[in-house]
Amino acid sequence: MNYDLRQMATFGVAGNFTGHLEQAGEAKDFKNITTKDENAPKAIFLIYLPIKNNSIPTFLLTFPFDSKKIVFPKNEENLQIEPECAIVCNVIWNNDKIENIHPIAFAASNDCSIRKDGAKKISQKKNWGNSSKGI
């Protein structure tokens, strides 16, 4: 089965395994988030959005995936390779609310990140251009 990832929104999960936010130096960004389980993920964030709209930051419109290479950003040295599992899902909507999510495919992924002080959003550390993610 083939999927056109360029037509699919891409999200990440912050804190998807215990201790990751601390290891990555990002725990301070989520200190005000409370969950029933202190080890639970803290947020969902956008990485890529294939919708052209003036209110969407330009970097979110850049398709980040490449199956052959990662292109490191210029003048950035603090990169962290993050092996992940990418999941393709069908999302069932009821008006403007998600009613259900059905996983339909998965693949190994390299969620390479820039550890960048001063970034206002985690998504700024995730999508810095074409070929910034492996799949």
Language-model features, listed with the residues they occupy:
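Glycine-enriched loop-and-adjacent helix/strand subsegments that border the catalytic/binding cleft
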Residues: 5-135
